[in-house]
């Protein structure tokens, strides 16, 4: 009996017993689950980046000779400008305030505060080491920490789903949804990043073979024990590359993924 219990516990916990610099990837029914250990060694090599001209996940992954590359924040494919804040090497490199296309729509202008305060993934260097957090953009960084890198997207999906708060849905006076962005209420490929305390960083890649709503993605995160999670750009942007071993793209264009603006990358 004791041997049987030990075997079950070993199977449950072996997935998260990974070396300090390892990338653990499992695929099940069209969902890729990527786990990184959130320690100094990993976080010094993990960064959020943007490119001047749009590039596919494959292109930037190959050019950077990265270990892991995952698609990042929102962008405008017409003017190739970011709709999300991006910080790289302790500096702001993308600011959606300067994306003139955001100001062409009256309803978007009216809700700019919500758009600019969407959720972001942060890497911080603090007095006691490197940390990660998922937070609204306007939430200040703790005074003992410095922002090293960040990418904004949204919405927050765990512990609560913030569709209205981050302007992904608009409701009329009776509470009926009259506008939807990023197909948040419909099933689509998704890229999710989540944090399990200060121990692990989780990426969930829901492929074309397993599209989900954000509510379904939220429940999936809860089952995995993820404490806090947010959506990155999804749909046709969903993509990731791992070394030269794995490539996942959504609705391939010319046998490669969509050209994108920003990425989360783990370097060698």
Where are the predicted features?
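Gly/Ser/Thr/Pro-rich low-complexity, intrinsically disordered segments
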Residues: 18-268
């Amino acid at each position: 009996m004791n041997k049987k219990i030990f075997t079950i516990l070993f199977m449950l916990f072996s997935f998260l017993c990974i070396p300090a610099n390892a990338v653990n990837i499992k695929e099940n029914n069209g969902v890729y689950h990527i786990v990184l250990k959130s320690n100094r060694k990993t976080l010094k090599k993990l960064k959020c980046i943007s490119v001047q001209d749009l590039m596919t996940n494959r292109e930037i992954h190959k050019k950077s000779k990265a270990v892991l590359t995952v698609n990042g924040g929102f962008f405008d494919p017409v003017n190739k400008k970011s709709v999300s804040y991006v910080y790289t090497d302790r500096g702001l490199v993308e600011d959606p305030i300067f994306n003139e296309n955001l100001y062409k729509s009256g309803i978007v202008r009216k809700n700019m505060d919500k758009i600019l305060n969407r959720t972001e993934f942060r890497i911080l260097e603090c007095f006691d080491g490197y940390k990660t957090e998922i937070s609204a953009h306007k939430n200040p960084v703790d005074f003992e920490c410095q922002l090293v890198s960040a990418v904004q997207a949204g919405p927050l999906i765990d512990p609560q789903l913030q569709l209205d708060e981050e302007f992904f849905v608009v409701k009329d006076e009776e509470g009926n949804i009259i506008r939807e962005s990023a197909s948040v209420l419909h099933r689509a490929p998704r890229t999710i990043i989540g944090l399990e305390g200060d121990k692990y960083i989780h990426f969930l890649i829901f492929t074309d073979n397993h599209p989900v709503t954000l509510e379904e993605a939220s429940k999936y995160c809860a089952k995995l024990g993820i404490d806090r999670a947010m959506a990155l750009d999804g749909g046709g942007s969903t993509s990731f590359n791992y070394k030269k071993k794995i490539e996942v793209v959504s609705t391939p264009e010319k046998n490669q993924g969509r050209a994108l603006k920003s990425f989360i990358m783990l370097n060698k």
